[in-house]
């Protein structure tokens, strides 16, 4: 026998469910069956833990919005605010994936079977920027959007049958 030590975690570590402030360590574009995506890796986490955000387009305007929202909420590649042809305010940004590196986001970790994953719905980090700024209220709003999405996914997930038994047949060896 020997004297040993072990960690004494209280459940609030780097893998606990909930919100985590993440720093993007690497980002690159990819393609899956003709759909573009950006994959993100984070400082302090293994390369096997990543976030993949797929492009999505508005059915009426055909404008891509999912990757654009990633750049906007990460405050990455933001150049300026401009007026769109329709007169609405628009954000001009550079979509080079390297612009995401070093940026901080709030990511929501959730349990998916045996694994922890990060939601593709992120929230910004409160900060004052040259073009875009996010307040604590903005962060709270985007976190609420994500939490509502996660709750909806859990509610719509197929039910898993409970195969445990507490009856007398539980002691039958066959």
Predicted regions and their residues:
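Short beta-rich binding modules
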Residues: 1-174
């Amino acid at each position: 026998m020997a004297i040993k030590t072990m960690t004494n975690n209280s459940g609030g570590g780097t893998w606990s469910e909930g919100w985590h402030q993440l720093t993007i360590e690497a980002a690159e574009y990819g393609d899956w069956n003709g759909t573009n995506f950006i994959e993100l890796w984070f400082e302090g986490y293994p390369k096997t833990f990543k976030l993949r955000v797929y492009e999505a387009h508005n059915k009426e305007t055909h404008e891509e919005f999912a990757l654009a929202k990633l750049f906007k909420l990460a405050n990455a590649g933001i150049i300026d605010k401009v007026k769109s042809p329709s007169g609405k305010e628009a954000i001009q940004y550079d979509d080079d994936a390297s612009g995401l590196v070093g940026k901080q986001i709030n990511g929501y970790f959730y349990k998916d079977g045996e694994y922890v994953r990060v939601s593709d719905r992120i929230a910004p980090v409160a900060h004052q920027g040259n073009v875009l700024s996010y307040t604590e209220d903005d962060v709270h709003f985007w976190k609420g959007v994500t939490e509502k999405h996660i709750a909806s996914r859990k509610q719509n997930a197929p039910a898993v049958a409970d195969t445990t038994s507490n009856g007398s047949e539980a002691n039958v060896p066959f």
